[in-house]
C-alpha cells in the first residue's frame, strides 16, 4: 500500500528559549485502484499536466473530408455504430435501437439487432417514408429502381432543365459580352460617315451664312457726311449739287439728311395764300451756309482741314422745319420776307444782306 507522510515544520525559536515540539507525521493510506490507474492526482497534489490530450471518439476522427455521415432519425445525432433492426431493415444508432422492443418508424416487433460498425459500410434509402438499409450496393440499386423509379425520372428531368437553363444563360451572357466588346465594322463605318456628313454640312452652312451677310455699312462717318451719289429710289429736284459738303468743325451738322420729296397724294404740302402762291413753314425764307470769310481760314487750317470752297445755296423743302445753323438768330416773321420768298425763285441772291436775312 502506498503511504503518504505529511510533516508540519517547526516554528522558530522564541526569545524565552522554549524548545519546539517534536514533528508530527501523519500516514494516509491510498487505495490500490488509484495506484493501478496511474492518475496524475495520485502522483502529486495540485500538479497540472502541460498539455491535455483530446481524443475524439467515433467516426468523426477517421472519416475523410466531404464524406457523408448518417444521422439517427430518433436522437438526431451522428451515428458511430449502427443498430440494424431485423426484419424491418431500419437502421438507428445502437443506443436507440436497444431502447425499445418495437421499431420507431414502422412499429414492427424487433426480432434481432445487427451491430454494424461505421467503416464496414451500409446503404440507407433516402426516399420519403422508406429509410431501409442495405449491406450490398447491388441490393440497394435494385430497390431504388423497383420502388422509386418515378423519383429518379423527376430528378433527371429537373437536372436536364437546370442544365438547359444554365446553357441558355451562358449563351446570352456570351452574346451580350461579344456585342459590348466588339461592335460590327459596318455600324462603326456608318456612324463615322454620319458624323463626317454632319460636320461637313455644319461647315457649309457656316460658310454660306458668312457669304450671305450684306456688307456692313460704314458707321464710322458722322451723320451728314454721305456720298453725293443719289439713291435709286429717290428723285432729287433739278437743283445744282453742292461742290463740297465738308464743313468746318465749329459748325453744327444738320440731323435731317433726307432731301425734299416730290408732292404726293394730290394735295399741296404747303398752305396757300390768298394770292395763290405756296407759303413754307418759315415763310419761305431761304438760307445759305456760312462762307469761308465768316468761318475763317485760320481755324480750318489749324485743325488740319483744307479750306472749303464756296458753298452754293441749299433750299430746304418739305413738311419738316429746316434747322438753323445760327441758333442765336431766329428768322423774323415779316411781310417783307414773305414777299421776298415769293420773288426770290432764282438762286444766288446777289443784292441780299446776310446779316439781315435779305432786308435792304
Curated annotation (Swiss-Prot):
<comment type="similarity">
    <text>Belongs to the Hakai family.</text>
</comment>
<dbReference type="InterPro" id="IPR013083">
    <property type="entry name" value="Znf_RING/FYVE/PHD"/>
</dbReference>
<dbReference type="GO" id="GO:0016607">
    <property type="term" value="C:nuclear speck"/>
</dbReference>
<keyword id="KW-0863">Zinc-finger</keyword>
<dbReference type="InterPro" id="IPR040383">
    <property type="entry name" value="HAKAI/CBLL2"/>
</dbReference>
<dbReference type="GO" id="GO:0061630">
    <property type="term" value="F:ubiquitin protein ligase activity"/>
</dbReference>
<feature type="compositionally biased region" description="Polar residues">
    <location>
        <begin position="270"/>
        <end position="283"/>
    </location>
</feature>
<feature type="region of interest" description="Disordered">
    <location>
        <begin position="156"/>
        <end position="360"/>
    </location>
</feature>
<feature type="zinc finger region" description="C2H2-type">
    <location>
        <begin position="123"/>
        <end position="148"/>
    </location>
</feature>
<dbReference type="GO" id="GO:0036396">
    <property type="term" value="C:RNA N6-methyladenosine methyltransferase complex"/>
</dbReference>
<keyword id="KW-0479">Metal-binding</keyword>
<comment type="function">
    <text>Probable E3 ubiquitin-protein ligase which is a subunit of the N6-methyltransferase complex, a multiprotein complex that mediates N6-methyladenosine (m6A) methylation at the 5'-[AG]GAC-3' consensus sites of some mRNAs. Associates with MTA, MTB, FIP37 and VIR to form the m6A writer complex which is essential for adenosine methylation at specific mRNA sequences. N6-methyladenosine (m6A) plays a role in mRNA stability, processing, translation efficiency and editing.</text>
</comment>
<keyword id="KW-0808">Transferase</keyword>
<feature type="zinc finger region" description="RING-type">
    <location>
        <begin position="72"/>
        <end position="107"/>
    </location>
</feature>
<keyword id="KW-0833">Ubl conjugation pathway</keyword>
<keyword id="KW-0539">Nucleus</keyword>
<feature type="compositionally biased region" description="Polar residues">
    <location>
        <begin position="163"/>
        <end position="179"/>
    </location>
</feature>
<dbReference type="GO" id="GO:0016567">
    <property type="term" value="P:protein ubiquitination"/>
</dbReference>
<keyword id="KW-0862">Zinc</keyword>
<comment type="subunit">
    <text>Interacts with MTB and VIR. Associates with MTA, MTB, FIP37 and VIR to form the m6A writer complex which is essential for adenosine methylation at specific mRNA sequences.</text>
</comment>
<dbReference type="GO" id="GO:0008270">
    <property type="term" value="F:zinc ion binding"/>
</dbReference>
<dbReference type="InterPro" id="IPR013087">
    <property type="entry name" value="Znf_C2H2_type"/>
</dbReference>
<feature type="compositionally biased region" description="Basic and acidic residues">
    <location>
        <begin position="1"/>
        <end position="11"/>
    </location>
</feature>
<feature type="region of interest" description="Disordered">
    <location>
        <begin position="1"/>
        <end position="24"/>
    </location>
</feature>
<protein>
    <recommendedName>
        <fullName>E3 ubiquitin-protein ligase HAKAI homolog</fullName>
        <ecNumber>2.3.2.27</ecNumber>
    </recommendedName>
</protein>
<dbReference type="InterPro" id="IPR040380">
    <property type="entry name" value="HAKAI-like_RING-HC"/>
</dbReference>
<feature type="compositionally biased region" description="Polar residues">
    <location>
        <begin position="186"/>
        <end position="214"/>
    </location>
</feature>
<feature type="compositionally biased region" description="Low complexity">
    <location>
        <begin position="293"/>
        <end position="304"/>
    </location>
</feature>
<dbReference type="InterPro" id="IPR017907">
    <property type="entry name" value="Znf_RING_CS"/>
</dbReference>
